[in-house]
Amino acid sequence: MYKNNKIKKTSCDLIIKIMFLLLISCNKNLLAENLYVGVASNFLEPINIIKEDFKKETGHNLIIINGSSGSLYTQIMNGGPIDIFLSAEQKLPKKLEINKKSVMGTRFTYAKGELKLWSLNKALFKKQFPEILSSNLVKYIGIGNPLFVPYGYASKEALEKIGIFKTLSDKLILGKNINQVFLMGYSRNLDLAFVAKSNIISNKNNKKGKIWNIPQNLYSPINQDGIMLLSGEKKKGAFKFLKFLVSDNVKKRIRDFGYIIE
């Protein structure tokens, strides 16, 4: 009799635990929000992984809107439905603060990027930087459009400091975002490509190529800022996401993609 009662009690305890877990799961789903996050192209692969981690932990779903920082800024200024903006630089988030399009006190630097020169053209592998840029073997050099793409602006800065930007103007192919520049290089439509370090690390076949380091004194620091927009202020999940981005686990993920975290 005692044994049967013990079995019944154990069964009841198990049922109660299962019901409790189901209740928590249901509540998480009921409270889950869709958060619209505008993400600079260089950060697309990291955010897709972070998105899954965030959903597992909180139940909230990130809807990613991807593009150059400049194009995302234009969307925001025109009333685009973006709750959080992860830019590839600092100027545009600061402008959103000035224009009162953001929640004050939410701007922060989530990563610092590095500019690299990269190629799949084996004929260039033995050349050194910056001499490689003036080689007769180089016909096409890809950079992001400096007007819209922060890594493109950094590329232009580097070329100007070396003193060859105008000389190379006929060879420059402008990409609408940094991912497009990388893909043009990967498809061998470019001899050289100025890309983010994260582009190279993210791509599983990057070992085929040659990477040239670009001295960081040739371009302004690429501090990538995030900020919450006014629509995000109404969503508890948006605040949770900003906190999640600065957690130790997420910082490690970001470092693994080639970014500097200070």
Q: Can you say where each PLM-predicted feature lies in the sequence?
A:
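Bacterial N-terminal signal peptides
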Residues: I15-S25
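Exported/periplasmic ABC-transporter solute-binding proteins
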Residues: E33-E57, I63-I65, G70, T74-G80, ...
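Short active-site loop at a secondary-structure junction
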Residues: G105
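Bacterial N-terminal signal peptides that target proteins for export
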Residues: Y2-I16
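Short regulatory "switch" loops immediately downstream of catalytic or recognition motifs
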Residues: M1-Y2, F20-L21, S202
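Sec/Tat signal peptide C-region and signal peptidase I cleavage site
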Residues: K28-A32
